[in-house]
């Protein structure tokens, strides 16, 4: 059982996640976004070859908090795998962009409405989404794991969830996986809009477990918030950079070319290693 000072410490860490989410959301609500990202001009010839309009700044929508892919650090900077990868690709290909911090559902809606040029938000490439969006080459292969309270010694597998409730985040692979097995293993689900509240529900004992993308939950566990992972990774989808179907082909082409270059020169792995320790 977590008590006293340890509980307060965990609560502060979860509160920090929640405040980061709220701060990012308020930026979007005020009509602002994270600072405009301008790539270096070193690869401008590549950008011209890809058919980029001179001086164009692409609007890229993202989630509010989906660590380690996008989140605000202690200095208030918006960082993460997605953010660092996009910055490096833009520098490699010589294009400019501006981040719109909207939340996942709102980011997708903004893209569909033509208010954004693309989405990068740990977005799984699925057949259903491919009917609506064109995706880049996969930039990350994900998967789903189950997390429980750190001092819980009773739950070790899906079989131990029978008769219990499980917390999931709306629109994630974790929620889809939970729905696919809950009839077999006899548990119910409660949905949350963000990871921090989902984690709090497990830590407080309202839910017995949560299902989450493994790099996201793995990063949260590394922050000592009071959770642990008890299952092996279930194979999941790959993440991709998305544009509306038939639109912004030049941006998609630059993303793919830049991604290939980063994988070749080692920068891609360097970015992953910054946030994920295997």
Spans of features found by a protein language model:
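C-terminal motif of bacterial Sec signal peptides marking the signal peptidase cleavage site
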Residues: 25-29
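Short, low-complexity, disordered segments immediately C-terminal to signal peptides
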Residues: 31-54
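Ligand-binding clefts/hinges and TM-proximal coupling segments of bilobed small-molecule sensing domains
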Residues: 32-33, 49-50, 98, 173-193, ...
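Extracytoplasmic small-molecule ligand-binding "clamshell" domains
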Residues: 46, 50-122
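Periplasmic-binding protein-like
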Residues: 64, 140-148, 218-260, 278
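Short helix-initiation/N-cap motifs at beta->coil->alpha
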Residues: 83, 98-110, 153, 189-204, ...
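A ligand-binding cleft/hinge motif common to bilobed small-molecule-binding domains
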Residues: 123-132, 177-180, 201-235
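Flexible hinge/capping segments at coil-to-helix
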Residues: 149-166
């Amino acid at each position: 059982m977590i008590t006293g000072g340890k509980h307060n410490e965990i609560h502060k860490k979860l509160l920090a996640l929640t405040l980061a989410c709220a701060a990012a959301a308020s930026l979007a609500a005020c009509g602002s976004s994270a600072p405009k990202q301008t790539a270096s001009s070193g690869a401008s010839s590549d950008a011209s070859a890809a058919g980029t309009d001179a001086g164009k700044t692409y609007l890229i929508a993202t989630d509010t908090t989906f660590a380690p892919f996008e989140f605000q650090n202690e200095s208030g900077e918006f960082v993460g795998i997605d953010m660092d990868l996009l910055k490096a690709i833009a520098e490699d290909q010589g294009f400019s962009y501006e981040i719109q911090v909207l939340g996942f559902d709102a980011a997708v809606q903004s893209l569909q409405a033509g208010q954004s040029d693309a989405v990068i938000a740990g977005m799984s490439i699925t057949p259903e989404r491919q009917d609506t969006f064109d995706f880049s080459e996969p930039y990350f292969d994900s998967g789903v794991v189950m997390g429980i309270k750190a001092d819980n010694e009773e739950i070790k597998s899906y079989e131990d969830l029978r008769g219990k409730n499980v917390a999931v985040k709306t629109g994630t692979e974790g929620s889809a996986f939970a729905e696919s097995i809950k009839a077999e293993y006899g548990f119910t689900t409660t949905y949350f809009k963000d990871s921090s509240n989902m984690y709090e529900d497990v830590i407080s004992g309202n839910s017995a477990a949560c299902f989450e993308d493994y790099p996201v939950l793995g990063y949260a566990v590394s922050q000592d918030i009071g959770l642990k992972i008890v299952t092996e990774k279930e194979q999941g989808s790959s993440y991709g950079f998305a544009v509306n179907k038939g639109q912004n082909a030049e941006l998609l082409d630059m993303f793919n070319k830049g991604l290939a270059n980063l994988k070749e020169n080692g920068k891609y792995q360097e970015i992953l290693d910054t946030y994920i320790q295997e």
